[in-house]
């Protein structure tokens, strides 16, 4: 009997040894292990500690990797996989060129953990992204902007209430969230629904729930994700809440399209209609149409809220910067009225927006990519199929070799560059380059960035022309938060504002 027990024990130990050996061989022969690790050890088991460090010190880990491996790649640990980081402008340029092998669509889906949050039918054909790319630039965008600019004064009046001639404390994030969602939705769904509090609340909830679950799932092992996936229903429930709000408008437009066809001369010029033009031939359900619209809302609004919050803090902190931007805005409005031309010529306002996106950013990383096949980079690095990749944005934007006084916030840095070299487009907030990637870079850069820049400048111009701003308390800006790879404004942060008196009669309305 004892001999039998010894044989069983020996067999168990042998099986365990074989399993360990197989696992070790697979680990040592995995091409991903040839990529240097930053933040700790890459050994099995110890990599979990590395992942924990990355979660809590992502900014420091990215900066260390950027300095150690310039114009190359390195990897950082996630809880169940590796994230490969493109480091430096030369590698960013290579990633841009390899778009056939490094998919942006799949990369964004991986970054957001979309397969757990969004409807799978939407993910298989993201034509709403093509709609934004085709319609939110050029002549179509210019045709939208008069209505968008008009909506700014209405939205500010709806969501920012001042108290007589005195100073009013404004909690910036929730106020700007409502203003931006309303202004954006003037171009998305038209003037009636964009002012519906119920609809705006649903759109905001969808965006917040998407961010929340993306963050939670990014630090959750795969086996746990599979267990909790059936219970992640908030974004889909938000879509169901929005369906009855949008159904009357959608059904009315579908009927008009069926009855009038090419004779529908007053056909709406908004994102909902552009989505319907593609959805109707596909016979998509009401749920999927609304789901797509809310996804566009999330993409267009979340980062804009954070960006405008940082700009407002800087304007409220420094009265000289505020006055310089105000004088320019008033001069351009006097010349061209509240138009896209006036907004395009507000170089100082555009400069402070671009500098804010460079200096603070809305994320520490950018340019989500997923390898659709084995990829060999120019330096010989092999990326196995399925590798998830991002670019290190924060250390790139703070690189003193690329940006003079990179660790100093210089609000009019890019306005001076436009004056000096005469290349206005090159230094606009919406123009990407290998050194400036808050919107990504290349043909797959954020397609809504031109629209977003106009919206942000229109809101900022309206506020600085019609209101005085200052910081409360000790007059210092509240600190920014870094959560995983996200850059977030502080909760509860406020500025003080009051309506300007004589000389501030210019409005967007």
Curated annotation (Swiss-Prot):
The chain crosses the membrane at residues 12-29. This is Cytochrome P450 monooxygenase CYP512U6. The gene is CYP512U6. Belongs to the cytochrome P450 family. Its EC number is 1.-.-.-. The keyword Transmembrane helix applies. It comes from the Eukaryota. InterPro entries: Cyt_P450, Cyt_P450_CS, Cyt_P450_E_grp-IV, Cyt_P450_sf. It catalyses: ganoderate DM + reduced [NADPH--hemoprotein reductase] + O2 = hainanate A + oxidized [NADPH--hemoprotein reductase] + H2O + H(+); ganoderate TR + reduced [NADPH--hemoprotein reductase] + O2 = ganoderate Jc + oxidized [NADPH--hemoprotein reductase] + H2O + H(+). It is found in: Membrane. Keywords: Heme, Iron, Membrane, Metal-binding, Monooxygenase, Oxidoreductase, Transmembrane, Transmembrane helix. Its cofactor is heme. Heme binds at residue 446. GO terms for molecular function: heme binding; iron ion binding; monooxygenase activity; oxidoreductase activity, acting on paired donors, with incorporation or reduction of molecular oxygen. GO terms for biological process: secondary metabolic process; terpenoid biosynthetic process. PROSITE patterns: CYTOCHROME_P450. The keyword Iron applies. Pfam families: p450. GO terms for cellular component: membrane. It is a single-pass membrane protein.
């Amino acid at each position: 009997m004892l001999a039998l027990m010894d044989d069983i024990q020996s067999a168990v130990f042998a099986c365990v040894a074989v399993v360990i050996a197989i696992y070790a061989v697979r680990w040592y022969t995995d091409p991903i292990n040839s990529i240097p690790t930053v933040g700790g050890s890459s050994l099995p088991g110890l990599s979990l500690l590395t992942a924990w460090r990355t979660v809590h010190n992502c900014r420091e880990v990215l900066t260390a990797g950027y300095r150690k491996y310039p114009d190359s790649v390195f990897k950082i640990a996630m809880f169940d996989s590796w994230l490969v980081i493109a480091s430096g402008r030369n590698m960013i340029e290579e990633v841009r060129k390899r778009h056939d092998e490094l998919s942006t669509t799949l990369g964004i889906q991986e970054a957001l953990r979309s397969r757990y949050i969004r409807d799978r039918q939407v993910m298989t054909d993201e034509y709403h992204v093509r709609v934004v790319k085709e319609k939110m630039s050029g002549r179509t965008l210019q045709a939208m902007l008069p209505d968008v600019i008009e909506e700014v004064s209405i939205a500010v009046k709806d969501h920012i209430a001042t108290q007589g001639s005195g100073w009013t404390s404004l909690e910036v994030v929730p106020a700007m969230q409502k203003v931006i969602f309303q202004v954006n939705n003037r171009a998305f769904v038209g003037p009636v629904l964009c002012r519906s509090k119920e609809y705006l609340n649903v759109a905001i909830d969808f965006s917040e729930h998407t961010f929340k679950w993306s963050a939670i799932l990014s630090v959750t092992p795969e086996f746990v994700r599979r267990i909790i996936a059936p219970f992640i229903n908030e974004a889909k429930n938000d879509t169901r809440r929005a369906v009855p709000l949008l159904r009357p408008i959608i059904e009315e437009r579908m009927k008009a399209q069926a009855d009038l066809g090419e004779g529908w001369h007053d056909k709406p010029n908004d994102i909902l209609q552009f989505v319907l033009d593609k959805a109707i031939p596909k016979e998509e359900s009401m749920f999927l149409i609304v789901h797509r619209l809310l996804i566009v809302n999330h993409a267009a609004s979340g980062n804009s809220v954070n960006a405008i919050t940082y700009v407002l803090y800087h304007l409220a902190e420094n009265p000289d910067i505020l006055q310089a931007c105000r004088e320019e805005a008033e001069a351009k409005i006097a010349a061209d009225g509240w138009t896209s031309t006036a907004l395009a010529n507000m170089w100082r306002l555009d400069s402070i927006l671009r500098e804010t996106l460079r200096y603070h950013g809305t994320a520490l990383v950018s340019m989500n990519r997923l390898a659709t096949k084995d990829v060999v980079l120019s330096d010989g690095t092999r990326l196995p199929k399925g590798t998830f990749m991002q670019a290190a944005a924060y250390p790139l934007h703070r690189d003193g070799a690329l940006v003079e006084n990179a660790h100093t916030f210089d609000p009019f840095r890019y306005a001076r560059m436009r004056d000096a070299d005469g290349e206005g487009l090159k230094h606009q907030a919406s123009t990407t380059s290998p050194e400036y990637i808050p919107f990504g870079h290349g043909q797959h850069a954020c397609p809504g960035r031109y629209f977003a820049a106009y919206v942000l400048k229109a809101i900022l111009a309206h506020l600085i022309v019609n209101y005085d701003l200052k910081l409360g308390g000790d007059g210092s800006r509240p600190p920014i938060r870094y959560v995983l790879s996200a850059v977030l404004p502080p909760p509860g942060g406020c500025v003080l504002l009051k309506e300007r008196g004589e000389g501030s009669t210019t409005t967007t309305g």
